Amino acid sequence: MKKLGTEKIPPLVGRGVLLDMTKHFNVEYMQLGQPITTDDIKLAAKSQNIKFQKGDVILFYTGWTDKMLKSDPDLWNSGEPGITNDAAKYLSSLNPMAVGADTWGVEVVPAIEGDKLFYGHITLLKENGILILETMNTGELVRENVDEFMFVLGQPKIKGTVQMIINPVALW
């Protein structure tokens, strides 16, 4: 990668918001293949009194990784709850700096009928330059009832890489 490696990405510092989708769906954790739609995002934000702002880091808590990574890693790896293609378009319209989740791909897997698998990556990253943050440890924020925080990430500057393990910080 010579043009778009992660060494070109500046440190990310901004307002983070966390949508607790387990609270929205009234479940301990979302299920494999369970979609997060545009309406779900709007309703969860409204119930948490979150008003999106340009440049936000928008994160989702599904409970999927907290519940399934250790108890059933094969199931955890076979699919996940996540955003739909339409939800990715809606999120892009909010002009966030980044979108992420506590899942390994952010998007629903398998894709819902009519959606293309991982097309949200194209919508967010390729078409809109919105960074994607996967397998984010958002559980502690939920347990502390934190919806809004300062998000700080100084990622490694490794030339030619397109992804990496990161350790962002949420300050509240």
Report the location of each language-model feature.
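Active-/binding-site microenvironments in catalytic and ligand-binding cores
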Residues: 1-172
